[in-house]
Amino acid sequence: MAARSGSRPDESPPPLARADGVTKRYRRGSEPGRVARALGRSSPPKVTALEDVSIDIAQEEIVGLAGPSGSGKSTLLHLLAGLELPSEGTVTFQGTDLNTLSTRKRTRLRLEHVGIVFQHFHLLDSLSARGNVALPLVELGVPKKERRKRATELLERVGLEDRVTHRPGELSGGEQQRVAIARALVTDPTLVVADEPTGELDTETGTRVLEQFERVAEDRAVVLASHDQPTLEIADRVVRLRDGRIDEEATVRAPSRTDT
């Protein structure tokens, strides 16, 4: 790919998100994901979920996080998404050190620029699929007409155009997961983080959800944490964690979706 005018051929754009020497400690019992369960009863009052981890997330790159339960995958996702701050080290997003932001500004940045899909996602039974997808836009103060339009468009993109007015109880597990994916993308985020996005789905449904996820995640940076090999196979790069440290890193396929 030809270098852009005014830039050197070996110059690469700055990372969208960066964790630099991050360590995260928790009081026992407050760890995210499966870290607490994996540590067991003999763990000390404070546990180290991540230790001296550094990783760059490029724009328009899919990064897979692999590793056993308790390896730190969920914790790293939380830090990259700005849901938590590191005990040591820095996490930057678009060049801004998240440690320097107030809780209010960090929440606003996350709502505007980060889409989050968790394995145990929560949909409100009192709202339709469209209402659930539009929730982040409500938080951002987007007018109702625009909320409905954008939520409907996202549901169409994940193949749920005939489920727009259905409530969660009227949807299958795979359909509910696609609603959660649409909700994560409705603000047009530049970064999407997903923790075991197909963890509770059967193989066939999981495959369909992954296909939809890969399609709608184009032109965004995506970080996926999973034990599931098919999920990791959609990544450009897989980073394996063990005991809170990066154990291995490998390129899985072409470096960038924009180069093909």
Where in this protein do the model-derived segments appear?
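The feature captures the beta-strand-to-loop junction immediately N-terminal to the Walker
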Residues: 66-68
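Helix-to-loop junction immediately C-terminal to a conserved catalytic motif
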Residues: 81
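Conserved ABC transporter NBD signature motif
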Residues: 89-97
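Conserved catalytic motifs of ABC-family nucleotide-binding domains
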Residues: 188
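Short coil-to-helix segment of the ABC ATPase nucleotide-binding domain corresponding to the Q-loop/switch region
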Residues: 124-135
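Catalytic Walker B motif of ABC-type/P-loop ATPase nucleotide-binding domains
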Residues: 192-195
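Conserved ABC ATPase signature
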Residues: 167-171, 175-177
